[in-house]
Regions:
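HIT superfamily nucleotide-processing domains
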Residues: 1-157
């Protein structure tokens, strides 16, 4: 259990455990994949560990490996479902002192002025909020890809 006071990450994990959080994409072994609150790049997701921990270095052994594998697998799903040319990953925890990974699809057709910018340089205020109407189909496809990749992974084990 985390020693940090409840953060937005704690609240998102609590909401993910219920059936009323529309942003939930999938439950993975290490935690929850959710759509970013602001879709600054369509398909932007977060991986939230469950249980919440303070930072990556608190995890050891299998739990650390599983989180990082789930992060990469989520990136595979986002890349496949968005047609992204690459995925940007970010793990900070400075503003919200609890482990969480940001997964951003980067596309070849992004405006030249921002194509090489890190995601925090983008206009988050102008980014559309996540909604099932606008992003639900993409969320569903990412979730299906993650479910299929889990099935293939368990067959290899």
């Amino acid at each position: 259990m985390s020693k940090t006071p409840p953060t937005a990450i704690h609240r998102m994990v609590e909401r993910s455990r219920t059936d009323d959080y529309p942003a939930v994409v999938a439950k993975l072994e290490s935690g929850w994949v959710i759509m970013g609150e602001r879709q600054v790049l369509a398909g932007y997701c977060l991986l939230l560990p469950d249980p919440v921990v303070e930072h990556l270095n608190v995890l050891t052994g299998v739990r650390r490996t599983r989180f990082l594998e789930d992060m990469a697998r989520t990136g595979d799903a986002v890349q496949h479902c968005t047609g992204a040319v690459r995925i940007n990953y970010a793990v900070f925890g400075n503003v919200e002192p609890a482990l969480h990974a940001h997964i951003f699809p980067r596309r070849a057709d992004e405006p030249a002025a921002t194509r090489t910018s890190q995601p925090w340089a983008l206009d988050w205020n102008a980014a559309p909020p996540y909604s099932d109407d606008a992003h639900g189909e993409l969320k569903r496809r990412i979730g299906e890809y993650l479910a299929k990749s889990a099935t293939h992974e368990s067959k290899r084990s």
